[in-house]
Amino acid sequence: MSQGLQLLFLGCACSLAPAMAMREVTVACSETADLPCTAPWDPQLSYAVSWAKVSESGTESVELPESKQNSSFEAPRRRAYSLTIQNTTICSSGTYRCALQELGGQRNLSGTVVLKVTGCPKEATESTFRKYRAEAVLLFSLVVFYLTLIIFTCKFARLQSIFPDISKPGTEQAFLPVTSPSKHLGPVTLPKTETV
């Protein structure tokens, strides 16, 4: 076999290696997920392990700091270099990467695991907002309509002098009590009339 063909096969094998190292774990909502580290490792050597959740933008955010043991993320000793996520939610779904660093610092190995959490209810706030969005828009529209109606009614009434502007000089206040001077109100007697 020629050297060029061997390099081609080697290149294909190297490009397929990350795809073969990726494993998928499916777990039901609120259950415990055990993610095994798929990096190839030598049982004769000791490694320091770190786990990270790969975000959609491609950057990694560390989910398991070495100092936090009370977190819902823990690395138990049941299975070497595995990550246990307790009480999984839909937010737990995603791609996780384990990195093994040889204690001598000579080799770094990594593997990828995809976690799928099924059976979780959708976000309550999001579905509630979607459910009542039309009613909220209608209520807001009615409030705006009634405020506009009140404002235009007051302006129209002022223009028609129903409610005169008393701050302007020369205008009288409406609804003042009207009294007539020196008119005595007493019993009224009607003259007698004859019927024919």
UniProtKB/Swiss-Prot annotation:
Any one Pfam family match given in the protein's UniProt record, by short name: V-set
Cellular localization per UniProt: Membrane
Deletion consequences: Lack of CD83 expression on dendritic cells enhances immune responses to acute infections and leads to a reduced expression of MHC-II and an exacerbated autoimmune neuroinflammation. In addition, CD83 deficiency does not result in excessive negative selection but affects the size of the CD4 single-positive compartment through a defect in positive selection.
GO biological process, one term: negative regulation of interleukin-4 production
Topological relation to the membrane, as annotated: Single-pass type I membrane protein
Disulfide bridge map: 37-98
Subunit structure, interactors included: Monomer. Homodimer. Homotrimer. Interacts with MARCHF1; this interaction antagonizes MARCHF1-mediated MHC II and CD86 down-regulation.
Protein name: CD83 antigen
Lineage, broadest ranks: Eukaryota, Metazoa, Chordata, Craniata, Vertebrata
